[in-house]
Amino acid sequence: AGQSITAKRLEQVDFTTPYYYASIVSLVMADGPYADAAGISDLAGATCTSQQTTVWYDTCLPQIENANILPAMESAPAMLVALDSGRCDLVVTDMPTAMAACVAYPDMKLLDFSGTEDDFAVSDEEINIGISVQKGNTALLDRLNEALATLTTDDFARMMDEAIAVQPLSEG
C-alpha cells in the first residue's frame, strides 16, 4: 500500500524509498468567500474539515487562525460532500485528491500555497509517500526499491495524473 512513511508506521511495516511528496492544498467553492485566498492567513475564521487520521486534519487545520474546525470526515468523498453542500468553507487535502475533486466537482477551486511564506508547515515525514510491505520482507522491499529507482520524477507525475483520471472521484 502507498502511504506516508511515519516513525509510528515503521514500527509495524517496512517502506520503500519515498516515490512521491504530496503537496498539501485547500479546496474551496469557486464562488465562495475564500476563493481569492493567497495564503493560509487569508483563510482565518473559515469553517473547515478534512479526512480523519490525516496530517491534513491533525496538523494543517489547526494552523488556520480562528478556524471553526468541524469533526473529521471518515473519507475523502465525505469531506468533499461537506464542502459541496455548504457545511464548510474549505477542506484541506493533498494535491492528487484535490485535482480529482476539481474534475468531479467543477465548482470547486484548488488553492495551492506551496513555495510561499504563507503555506501549511509540515515535515517531510508527513508528506512523503512510499510503498509499505510486511516487516522483514527484504526480498520484496529490495525488488520494489530497484523498480522505483528506474523511474524519474516525470514518470511518477505522469502515473499520478493517469491515476487521478481513472479514480472514482473523477468519473462524474
Can you say where each PLM-predicted feature lies in the sequence?
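Proline/Glycine/Serine-rich low-complexity intrinsically disordered segments
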Residues: 1-172
